[in-house]
Structure formats: C-alpha cells, structure tokens
C-alpha cells in the first residue's frame, strides 16, 4: 500500500471516529433530557465528561502505542471500535435502570453521573484510536517526524 493511500485511509478513520464521538454527545443529550430536562447543566455535564474522557483516551492510546509491539498496532486499532460498540450496547442496557434512580438526585450530580454512564468507556476507546493511527502512519512512511500534521 502506498504512503498516500494509507494516509488517506488513516485520515478517513480519524474523521469517522470524530463523527461517532460527536454523535454520541448528541444522543446522550436526547437520552438525558427526559430525566433532567434540557438545561445548561446537561450540556455542561456532557461536554465536561466528553473532554475528560477524550483526554484519558488519548493518553491510553499513546500509552498503548508504547507498550504494544508495532506489528500488533493494526489488530489493536481494529479491536478498539469493537470494544466501544460493546460499551455503547452495555450503556444502552444500563441507562433505563440507572437514570430513573438518578433523577431523584440533584440536577448537577445526576447529569454528571448519567453522562459518565453513557459516555465514559465508549469515548476512551474511540479516542484511543487516534494515537494508534498516528503511530501506524509513522510506520507506513518510515519517517519519525510525520504523523499528526499535514
């Protein structure tokens, strides 16, 4: 595979993971709305949880690129969306049980815990893909100074 072809594929994968992350945020707002309303607190909770767990996912992905051998990066990259889909499925099963119980708590605590339940693990695994993609791009171009930028 040529370097340009692999670069286009990697950029498309990064674009798709970003789109899925944005979709999860919007879906979380619609799921939380019946329990906590559509308020500034809900959006604050969703955006705060998103930023925290994106940062943790980037850290986790960078750590995985250092700990896992380079030849296993592709299989690791393929396993991350599967893990994310599994946790999205589990949060779909958990939210009808957890969110009604949280609706009796304060708006701030309930919205943050609800956002955590819905978003934490899928965001970690989706955002961990970006450092691994950058590592794979560096491997395909045989240049240690390429990757994140254009």
What name fits each language-model region?
Residues 1-150:
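Alpha-helical transmembrane segments of multi-pass membrane proteins
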């Amino acid at each position: 595979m040529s370097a340009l072809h692999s670069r286009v594929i990697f950029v498309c994968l990064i674009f798709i993971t970003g789109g899925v992350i944005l979709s999860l945020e919007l879906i979380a707002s619609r799921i939380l709305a019946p329990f906590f309303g559509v308020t500034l607190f809900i959006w604050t909770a969703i955006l705060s949880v998103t930023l925290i767990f994106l940062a943790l996912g980037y850290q986790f992905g960078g750590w995985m690129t250092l700990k896992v051998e380079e030849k296993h990066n592709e299989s690791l990259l393929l396993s991350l969306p599967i893990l994310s889909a599994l946790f999205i499925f589990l949060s779909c099963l958990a939210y009808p049980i957890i969110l009604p119980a949280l609706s009796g708590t304060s708006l701030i605590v309930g919205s943050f815990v609800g956002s955590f339940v819905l978003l934490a693990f899928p965001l970690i695994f989706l955002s961990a893909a970006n450092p691994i993609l950058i590592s794979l791009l560096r491997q395909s171009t045989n240049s240690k100074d390429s990757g994140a930028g254009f």
